[in-house]
From Swiss-Prot:
This is Translation initiation factor IF-3. GO terms for molecular function: ribosome binding; translation initiation factor activity. Monomer. IF-3 binds to the 30S ribosomal subunit and shifts the equilibrium between 70S ribosomes and their 50S and 30S subunits in favor of the free subunits, thus enhancing the availability of 30S subunits on which protein synthesis initiation begins. One of its GO terms (biological process) is ribosome disassembly. It comes from Chromobacterium violaceum (strain ATCC 12472 / DSM 30191 / JCM 1249 / CCUG 213 / NBRC 12614 / NCIMB 9131 / NCTC 9757 / MK). The gene is infC. The keyword GTP-binding does not apply. GO terms for cellular component: cytosol; membrane.
Length: 175
């Protein structure tokens, strides 16, 4: 369902087709089951709209309210919910079987930063030429990365070979 169709989900005033409705007042108080004509008269008297809140109920539930204000509140709620969502990104760090300690520490520091920021990390180990014959060296390096990141992340996908590279996914630890 599109956002526009979802917004027009609630029928108002003349769009309501039921003969009898359960009416709720402006402050949320129950008025009771009344005819549609009575409810429309009450809405006009109070200078508000009659909005169908629950069309599937028997009888349908309608509320006296300012529809413009209602739409604004709904869009505000949607906007806040969207802001609270955090988009998890996957950051990638590439290693080689011959990565020295200095480079290893820099890459490890970046991995720790990614995981503490809440992002997932993809650790890629690239083999070139004859290095493919020594996959055990690469596996040992990935095991070392896993051990060094044990306190900030958990391995989501264990090392597996994809063509000429080994890939391992690490997710941040839940707080």
């Amino acid at each position: 369902m599109s956002a526009i169709a979802q917004e027009r989900e609630a029928r108002i005033n003349g769009e309501i087709t039921a003969r009898e409705i359960r009416l709720v007042g402006k402050e949320g108080e129950q008025i009771g089951i009344v005819s549609l004509r009575e409810a429309m008269a009450l809405a006009e008297e109070n200078d508000v709209d009659l909005v169908e809140i629950s069309p599937t109920a028997q009888p349908p539930v309608c509320k006296l309210m300012d529809y413009g204000k209602y739409k604004y509140e709904q869009s505000k709620k949607r906007h806040e919910a969207k802001q609270k969502q955090k988009q998890v990104q996957i950051k990638e760090i590439k290693f080689r079987p011959g990565t020295d300690d200095g480079d290893y520490n820099v890459k490890l520091r970046n991995l720790v930063r990614f995981l503490t920021e809440g992002d997932k990390a993809k650790v890629t180990l690239r083999f070139r030429g004859r290095e493919m014959a020594h996959q055990d060296i690469g596996l040992a390096l990935l095991k070392r990365v896993e051990a060094d990141l044990a306190e900030v992340g958990t391995v989501e996908q264990f090392p597996r070979l994809e063509g000429r590279q080994m890939v391992m996914m690490i997710a941040p630890k839940k707080k």
